[in-house]
Amino acid sequence: MKQPMSLKINPPTTPLFIARMFFPLIAIALLSVQIHAQTSYKFDFGVSTNAAVAGYTKVTPANKYTTAYANDNTNGTFGFEDWDSTAWGAFSRGAASDNLNRDFIYTRSHNGFSSFYFSVRVPEGKYTVTFYIGDPGDTSTTNIKAESRRFLVENLRLAKGQLATRTFTVIRREPAIAGGGTVGLDYSYGREDPSICLNWDHKLTFEFSGARPCIGGLDIVPVDSGITFHMCGNSTLVEQEDEPWSCWGAFVHRFFNSSIIVNDLASSGLTSSSFLSQRRLAKICSVMKPGDYLFFEFGHNDSKGSVSQSQFEANMKTYYDSATSHQATMVFVTPTARSGDSDSSTSIGNYAQYTRDYAKTLSGAKLVDLNAAVIHMKTALGAAAYGGNGKAIYCYASASNQWPDLPAGASDDTHFCDFGGYELAKWVSHTGLKAAGIDLRKYLLDTTAFDPDKPDLKSAWIFPYSIDTVFRHASPGGTVFKDTVSAVSDVASGGSIPSLLRSISVNHGSFTILYSGYLTGKAEISVFSMSGKTMARKVMVLEKNSRAIAWKELNGLPAGVYFIRMQVNNSALGKSAFFKL
């Protein structure tokens, strides 16, 4: 195994290395770099022939955040997440020693998959991050996200030679709670599994995407100041790990400057009670400070019978008491409306109204009526002037190969797409908070009010999705990593139950697909390019007691990134897997 490159920082130190274990199947040897723990982390992106700007650490495409050293917990380990290094690289406009933008990392492709990811192992805490953006010799268009798709920079278009900086403050958190205990993470489907989920994987990760993102460097500085929005909620507020779903909590950062920090501990399936039992509020209370805001948005799961009105109101009081005891402001948010809701007073089994009514009884509590705003918004979007699609904010995806885990598409009348999450966050940030008596306008990047009766045009909204949530790590040379997988229902014939897709290996063009459980019946295996083009297809009959499929006819595929989907008796066998040749 190759030893990773080390970078000497004064005082010298013996390099130790850490890995993110996306999938514990295979340890891979890639170049990795570790730097001595320090107060700030400053990186100069570019080519190896240019020396680093004084005070910065040079980073080139050779510096990969490897999974080969999973047992190390050394802060300062850094590198690029290597999902497809053919799509991005380094470029130099000169060797000036005092200009971070004279060389940079950028994407070569313009096909919608123009992304690269950079990760740094840092201690838990708040960090102000400054990005150095642009190309001295060409145009650039850059989007930036942090962790699990927290949106920071939106389509920053810079003219030839134009350079810019953007600064935000983000949180890196751990499940452990100061004083004892841990947050009860959701490991189902890998949602909050620290080996997969960017929000919980012990490092800060930034995603750069767009038509031509150009990043010359970045500063990461630990801070203890700022106003934090602590988010308590369910899947309508969570920072969704996987496309094409999204929620408003992931977009709030986009509209505020670095004085506002979002700490979103919402998680799918939670009620106002289970959020407490998973010690998520306890985690928030361990870091909440005077001047912070505690947001509460529940009701969707409470209304399904597990939490009565009286218990819901008692829970509201618990959250309120926690906020006031920390000299923070309590903000109750009515639960988002479903696409079929038209009456805000009865929406979500009356829990929107319960939230309104009980919030009025608590002194100093604020109310953001998001439920009513969503109903206005979807009504407006249904008008011809806005495209005539009232469901435009919800997660609908047509049957295609764009989403390999959704071969039949998606029709979700509860959860939101990226556009929906963006629109809701824009309304909360620009209008909802002010209407609730919370004046944070001086922290907004744009103070223009947002009217839910006059939403943005979805057709004019450009937003690249996060490729890392569609395709997980793949190593050079053909090794395959599986995505998180889940069992599906009984197949149509024979009653066999497809269990978990275990792994796929590639050796000189021959695929071996391993799966647990015993399957019988018709199997269909398809290989697609990242643009969705079918590259190969195999239909075969599975023999009883079989646990593996060999496929030797793929050695003609050109080098590139592909995904493979397996179906048995027309039922998808877990999620798709991705590989690189």
What is the predicted role of each segment?
Residues 492-496, 537-542, 550-555, 559-581:
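C-terminal tail/sorting-segment detector
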Residues 337-376:
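Substrate-gating cap/lid alpha-helix
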Residues 482-510, 518, 533:
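Residue-level detector of functionally pivotal "anchor" positions at catalytic/ligand-binding pockets or at interdomain
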Residues 221, 226-318, 450-481:
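Conserved SGNH/GDSL esterase-like catalytic core that processes O-acyl groups on lipids
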Residues 44, 228-233, 237-238, 261-266, ...:
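Structural recognition of the beta-strand scaffold that forms the well-ordered cores
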Residues 38-243:
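Compositionally biased, intrinsically disordered or flexible polar/acidic segments
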Residues 421, 528-535, 562:
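Short, glycine-anchored, charge-dense loop/turn motifs used at functional sites
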